[in-house]
Regions:
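Flexible, glycine/charged-enriched surface loops at secondary-structure junctions
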Residues: 34-40, 54-55, 70-78, 185-193, ...
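Catalytic alpha/beta core of large soluble enzyme barrels
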Residues: 117, 125-149, 438-449, 490, ...
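Terminal amphipathic helices with adjacent charged low-complexity linkers/tails
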Residues: 75-111, 147, 337, 419-451, ...
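Conserved catalytic alpha/beta cores of large enzymes that bind or transform nucleotide phosphates
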Residues: 271-281, 288-398, 403, 492, ...
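A glycine-rich phosphate-binding loop feature that marks nucleotide/adenosyl-phosphate handling sites
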Residues: 42-43, 61-63, 79-85, 197, ...
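Internal maturation/activation junctions in enzymes
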Residues: 197, 483-504, 529-622, 694
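Function-dense linear segments that define catalytic or interfacial modules
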Residues: 155, 162, 169-187, 191, ...
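Core nucleic-acid recognition elements
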Residues: 11, 34-172, 176, 189-195
Length: 752
């Protein structure tokens, strides 16, 4: 008797080698420079009686994936197709997808899809949309992309691992959900437009949308910003808000900077304050149980001002020294600075540390809302011997900051004055007091007093993300259509989703969006431009200008249809101030480009109709979606032609797009002479966009004497970033000789 195999459904049949050959040959059809026989030879399948067909299939997938290299990049596609074959068999029982209407009915009945899909759309509409789905677009994905779909995006039972759909079905359902409340006469076309944008990889959606829209859990904002006040009720309200959002797919930015430091008097001296270290540890521990539906670990970034009384205890909380009781290593930290403190550093002065509630909280308030008033009050408090304060040389304080940043890579910087001067919000009405997990969001917040009170004055800020794939852009005008469709879809999402915390519903009054880019490096490489070239600076200026112009144009169009957002009067746009009016002028020394768009016409349009959205743009990390769209990560220069990214399936080889193609010339991160040229491009982008940028610094230690990065270089670059107007600085990367690329923002939430 011959060898038998056991199929997924438990049945047993005779092993047929020809079936394996046919599948491998099929996976290579139409793909240049790949060999079915090489895949089969590498697989060396170990046959034995009763072997499971899934095991055979997994071996073939691994065999094809192991052949992926810079020399043979196209093995990405047979590996992806073999994995797709497996996923479709799991979802549909065979390779051909189930009819869409029957599939929706079945999956709604299983509790995996939101039932509004069958109440908002008729059977006839769904059957029509089924004819639009192009399942062959699944063949355009690389192996890394298909693994991301399997691991993060496809609706599945996260306990058993059972998959319920394939990529194109998921994308059509996302489009149906986001356009479900559009005018029924125009709705189907809007569904098709969004589906085509996403399925042809012109637009990239974030993990919460990709993994969540179409399911009954309706929370899709990537970034959540929570502010804690100094009152005990506010401290615990922040804990509860953090927990609710961390459990529902969001990354957390939490500002505890208003909380008094150690030994501050409570109730007129009845009690001494225990300090912020224990509170930060409590915040960290409350993240631990938030599973986020199996999609990612809960992650957070905690903010405080450099002049906080507890600075010396807080700045070391990320490092591996000290005891557990004095550390909270599983979160990141954002240190808030302004020009006043950089000037103290430059002039060799001192930094005085105060409790944030000093002067009835005015010092803390002015730190964000009024820079002149802050400097005046700070110096007045320094001169008053009755005010408790501690003191360090500015060089000592900044050196400690730079050392911790270098050792951990994850002590971030928020330049709060830039966040409020180059802002779409009026700082005296809606100041920016923190950022988010990945440092690209800058939105107003306010402490919550009672999380269950609908009249509470607290505000949790939310931002909903997306990115335009610049690899698909040939000319600047190509930006307009994907931008228009994306702004509409994300604005719809704000009304479509639920708000687990009442204070977050103020998002509906601001309607904040954060649309950015992915694949900038490929965009430049196709044009033969290096990050460090003057030509790249001018090209990025034109690109960023057109991008923001089209975003504002799209939001004006929505305002004409639906009205301006309710809190439009809190924006600088309502005062006639555009991005071209409020940026830091030093950036214009970095390029020679002239403005190309008709800003005065747009200014008039905004004055007449307002904007639907308080914010529209940001530049986020794109580690995950860059794999889906086969693009370079966001606005970052790639580390090399191939990197390996962690996934549940192991290390995924990821190649930059166009590698080896004639005329495609990349400038890789580790070939650059430090981060200066990259920082210049980021500053040019920051000139136009509403919020901030996940801007990194990066170093090769062996470029410096003794193979050690000098702290003065770290400080030089932080001060340079400030000088050219950057609002935030994210990771410090240090080359360790490996080509592994971690998934950056651990939660995956506020990145794409």
């Amino acid at each position: 008797m011959g060898i038998t195999v056991r199929k997924r459904n438990g049945s047993v049949e005779k092993f047929e080698a020809e079936k394996i050959n046919r599948v491998v040959v099929w996976s290579c059809e139409g793909v240049n420079d790949v060999s079915p026989s090489d895949i089969l030879m590498k697989s060396q399948i170990q046959m034995y009686d009763g072997v499971e067909t899934d095991a055979i299939h997994d071996t073939l997938i691994k065999s094809a994936a192991d052949l992926i290299s810079v020399e043979s990049p196209n093995y990405q596609y047979p590996a992806a197709r073999l994995l797709l074959f497996k996923l479709r068999k799991q979802a549909y029982g065979g390779f051909e997808p189930r009819p869409l209407y029957a599939h929706i009915l079945m999956t709604v009945a299983r509790g995996k899809y939101d039932e509004h899909l069958i109440s908002d759309y008729t059977k006839e509409e769904i059957e029509f949309l089924d004819t639009v789905i192009d399942h062959d677009r699944d063949f355009d994905y690389t192996y890394a992309a298909m693994r991301q779909y399997e691991d993060k995006y496809l609706v599945k039972d996260r306990v058993t691992g059972e998959i319920f759909e394939s990529p194109q079905t998921a994308l059509m359902l996302i489009a149906m959900c986001l356009m479900s409340k559009e005018d029924p006469k125009k709705r189907l076309q809007k569904v098709i437009d969004l589906y085509n944008m996403v399925s042809t990889m012109k637009v990239s959606l974030p993990t919460p949308i990709m993994g969540g829209v179409r399911t009954p859990t309706r929370q899709f904002s990537s970034c959540v910003l929570i502010e804690s006040g100094d009152d005990i009720n506010q401290i615990f309200a922040a804990v509860e808000a953090q927990g609710k959002y961390a459990a529902q797919r969001a990354g957390i930015g939490l500002n505890f900077g208003a909380i008094r430091g150690q030994d501050a008097p409570i109730r007129g001296g009845e009690v001494k304050h225990a300090g912020t270290v224990g509170i930060v540890r409590m915040y960290q521990e409350s993240l631990g149980w938030a599973s986020q539906g199996g999609l990612r670990k809960a992650s957070a970034n905690y903010f405080y001002p450099i002049w906080h009384w507890d600075f010396e205890n807080l700045i070391v909380m990320k490092n591996n020294r000290g005891t557990e009781s004095t550390r909270a290593r599983h979160v990141d930290y954002g240190v808030q600075i302004n020009k006043f403190f950089y000037t103290r550093l430059q002039k060799g002065g001192k930094i005085s540390f105060f409790h944030p509630n000093v002067a009835n909280g005015d010092l803390y308030k002015y730190f964000f809302s009024d820079q002149e008033a802050f400097a005046e009050l700070y110096e007045k408090l320094e001169a008053d011997p009755s005010i408790p304060r501690k003191e360090l040389e500015a060089t000592d304080a900044f050196t400690r900051l730079a050392q911790e940043r270098s050792q951990t890579g994850r002590i971030y910087i928020q330049n709060v004055d830039h966040c409020n001067s180059n802002s779409p919000f009026l700082p005296d009405v809606a100041p920016i007091k923190q950022s988010n997990l990945c440092m690209e969001i800058a939105l107003p917040t306010a402490p919550i007093n009672n999380i269950k009170d609908p009249k509470d004055s607290g505000e949790v800020a939310l931002c909903t993300l997306s990115a335009i794939n610049l690899g698909k852009i040939e000319k600047l005008e190509d930006l307009e259509e994907p931008v228009m469709i994306t702004v509409r879809a994300l604005d719809n999402l704000l009304d479509y989703q639920n708000y687990p915390v009442l204070a977050a519903e103020k998002t509906l009054l601001r309607r904040t969006l954060g649309i950015g880019w992915t694949n900038l490096a490929y965009y430049l490489a196709k044009r033969g431009l290096k990050y460090s070239s003057p030509e790249a600076a001018n090209e990025v200026h034109k690109l960023a200008e057109a991008f923001q112009f089209y975003l504002l144009k799209a939001s004006v169009q929505l305002a004409k249809e639906r009205g301006a957002c309710e809190w439009y009067d809190q924006t600088s746009y309502s005062r006639g101030i555009l991005p071209i009016d409020r940026y830091k002028k030093e950036v214009d020394q970095l390029h020679t480009a002239e403005l190309q768009q008709d800003w005065e016409s747009l200014r008039l349009d905004i004055a007449l109709h307002g904007l639907r959205n308080s914010t529209l743009s940001t530049m986020m990390p794109c580690e995950t979606s860059s794999q889906i769209t086969n693009s370079t990560n966001g606005i970052e220069p790639p580390r090399g032609p191939v990197t390996f990214k962690k996934s549940p399936a192991g290390m995924l080889p990821t190649l930059v797009p166009g590698v080896g193609e004639e005329g495609v010339v990349y400038e890789y991160k580790w070939d650059m002479n430090g981060p200066t040229a990259y920082l210049n491009l980021m500053a040019i982008i920051q000139k136009f966009i509403d919020q901030s940028i996940s801007t990194n610094t990066f170093y090769k230690p062996w470029d410096y004497p003794g193979g050690k990065l000098p702290i003065k270089i770290v400080l030089r670059d932080l001060m340079y970033a400030y000088k050219i107007g950057l609002k935030t600085v994210y990771y410090q990367e240090t080359r360790d000789g490996e080509d592994e690329e971690d998934d950056g923002c651990e939660s995956g939430a506020c990145k794409l």
